[in-house]
A protein has these predicted regions:
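Interhelical loop/hinge segments that connect adjacent transmembrane helices in multipass membrane
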Residues: 1-11, 183, 202-247, 287, ...
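N-terminal membrane topogenesis motif
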Residues: 1-29, 83-92, 217-239, 345, ...
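Signature of the first transmembrane helix
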Residues: 10-72, 96, 101-109, 135-136, ...
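Transmembrane helical elements of multi-pass membrane transporters/channels
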Residues: 13-30, 165, 189-197, 201, ...
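Helix-loop junctions and terminal segments of transmembrane helices
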Residues: 64-80, 150-151, 210-214, 270-319, ...
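Interfacial segments at transmembrane-helix termini and the short loops linking adjacent helices
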Residues: 112-132, 261, 326-358, 465
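Hydrophobic alpha-helical transmembrane segments
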Residues: 126, 130, 160-210, 271, ...
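Transmembrane alpha-helical segments of multi-pass transport proteins
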Residues: 386, 436-499, 506-507, 526-530
């Protein structure tokens, strides 16, 4: 097995563990959200969201890129077997996040009256904002633990923490609301759940920390480590803050120019359905960063090139077909849950999904490679470019085309930055994406999506049973079409199957199912003489 394949195996294993954690925690949280919406009035539910908004905004200034630096340096030092520096990274990272988190929580607590009265014009929510302010500190524990798990590629521990947070949040919020505490109980339950998850995360990180050797002659270099981490991570933190302001601007121009609330409702529904794609995209993005951080281009240039091309091709083989499948099934999927209440939502979902097709040209890999190799200042420049394009583009597009204009703007605003990133990677690392593979993946997935869509259009869809039938047949038609087209067009070849077999070994019991699938593809290849 090549080192690139071995790294892909480790990353795939981590991604799989993150996937089941994301799915389970999202399902639990969704159930809780639905129940909470039934227990609280629409007004109280709105106050719950408003009270959490201000601390969430202030929390953006807590990180300073430290968590990203924890991932980067723990992965790098782990590959170098430099345990002493990993210890310093963990201790320095937690110390910084806790101190700054506490300071910002106190600041939010102090400003709660001003925020409630002047900013939100709702003096009655002062107490809610005061309690919600502690999310800045408790959230610091969770996010720092997540960074430590990611850098050490222990994503099963992260999934345990996520599920505990979702379960406690759902149970505590519902329980306290049922006790008659209303919005106050919902806020209390949320904070207690995040605190519980944070404590669990810290304890799990401590178990990893205790396993490290502890030579008595080596001291923790906390101040030097913090300086190094801030120097690396601060540009990324600035970029995150700028991107956050851009997201707020999107919401502002939508509310300002789109006067039809039903269109905004349909947009909200379609946004929730995009989560189906992010279930697959997020684990890929998360695990690529530590993978690139472990490589030194000066010493392992050829390996880095292979890993980059691997990452683009195999992330595209996962995300792009899922994206086209979601597009093809947008109508039955949304109408099963909501009927005809949100008629524009399927179209909005199709348009929002387009952004994930850029996975085929490296949208999930390029930034991770640049950050993993330490070029965070350049990544900040890319973010500034995106923001500079995003403000005027979204304003013009929403003014002219409403929600559709917003979706087009948000889906394409990152393209210039992506092209510059690919140019930077080509110039500095001498590697480009495999354009032939990317085009084949897009073609095979797109054609499968079209076949699925037109096949379903021939079926009746007037009843709930018929919609379920469409959904089931749609998945079957897409899966068969994609496999056959991929074989005929050589989108997947025998080398890919060998690599997939090796990577699948990281999936434990599921590897047997994947091997059965790979064996089936091999049989079909022989039939088609590919």
């Amino acid at each position: 097995m090549s080192k690139a394949t071995e790294m892909a195996k480790v990353s795939a294993k981590g991604g799989f563990h993150l996937l089941w954690g994301l799915v389970a925690s999202t399902v639990i949280s969704s159930v809780g959200t639905i129940i909470l919406a039934g227990l609280l009035s629409s007004g109280d539910l709105g106050l719950y969201a408003i009270a959490l908004a201000a601390p969430n905004l202030i929390a953006n200034f807590r990180d300073w890129g430290i968590n990203t630096a924890i991932v980067k340096y723990s992965a790098q030092y782990r590959s170098e077997n430099n345990i002493a520096k990993i210890r310093s990274v963990f201790v320095a990272g937690f110390a910084f996040e806790i101190i700054l988190g506490l300071a910002l929580s106190l600041l939010s607590l102090f400003l709660s009256g001003f925020l409630a009265t002047t900013f939100y014009n709702r003096p009655a929510i002062t107490q809610l904002i005061q309690i919600a302010s502690f999310f800045i500190l408790t959230g610091a524990l969770v996010s720092t633990a997540t960074a430590a798990f990611t850098g050490m590629e222990k994503m099963h521990l992260n999934s345990i923490m996520l599920i505990i947070q979702s379960a406690f949040k759902t149970g505590l919020i519902i329980g306290l609301v049922l006790l008659g505490l209303g919005t106050l109980g919902a806020i209390d339950g949320f904070i207690l759940a995040v605190l519980t998850a944070g404590i669990v995360g810290v304890l799990l990180v401590f178990t990893m920390y205790r396993e490290f050797p502890n030579p008595s002659h080596i001291k923790l270099e906390l101040m030097q480590t913090i300086k190094t981490m801030i120097k690396y991570g601060l540009p990324l933190s600035i970029g995150t803050i700028l991107a956050g302001f851009l997201a707020y601007f999107y919401s502002f121009v939508m509310a300002f120019f789109v006067t039809d609330n039903s269109l905004i409702g349909s947009y909200s529904v379609s946004t929730n359905f995009v989560v189906l794609i992010t279930f697959f995209a997020t684990p890929v993005t998360t695990m690529l960063f530590p993978a690139f951080s472990k490589l030194d281009f000066a010493k392992e240039g050829e390996l880095l090139k292979n890993v980059f091309q691997f990452s683009v091709k195999y992330s595209a083989l996962i995300v792009v077909p899922v994206t086209f499948l979601v597009m093809a099934l947008a109508h039955p999927g949304i109408f099963i849950l909501f009927g005809s209440k949100y008629p524009e939502a399927p179209l909005f979902l199709v348009l929002q999904s387009v952004a994930y097709l850029f996975t085929a040209i490296g949208s999930l890999s390029a930034g991770n490679l640049i950050n993993g190799q330490g070029f965070t200042k350049y990544n900040l420049m890319l973010t500034i470019l995106t923001v500079a394009v995003g403000f005027p583009l979204s304003f013009v597009m929403v003014f002219q085309f409403g929600i559709i204009g917003l979706i087009v703007a948000t889906s394409t605003v990152g393209v210039p930055s992506l092209l510059f990133a690919l140019r930077f990677i080509k110039k500095n690392f001498g590697v480009s994406i495999d354009w032939h593979s990317s085009i084949k993946i897009l073609f095979s997935s797109g054609l499968s999506g079209l076949l699925t869509y037109f096949s379903l259009s021939l079926l009746p869809s007037s009843s709930l049973l018929q919609l379920f039938t469409q959904l089931i047949f749609g998945v079957i038609i897409f899966a068969i079409s994609f496999v056959l087209i991929s074989i005929i067009t050589r989108t997947i070849n025998k080398t890919d199957l060998t690599n997939i077999r090796q990577i699948a070994k990281g999936f434990g019991p599921l590897s047997k199912l994947l091997n059965i699938f790979v064996n089936l593809i091999e049989i079909l290849m022989k039939i088609f003489r590919v």
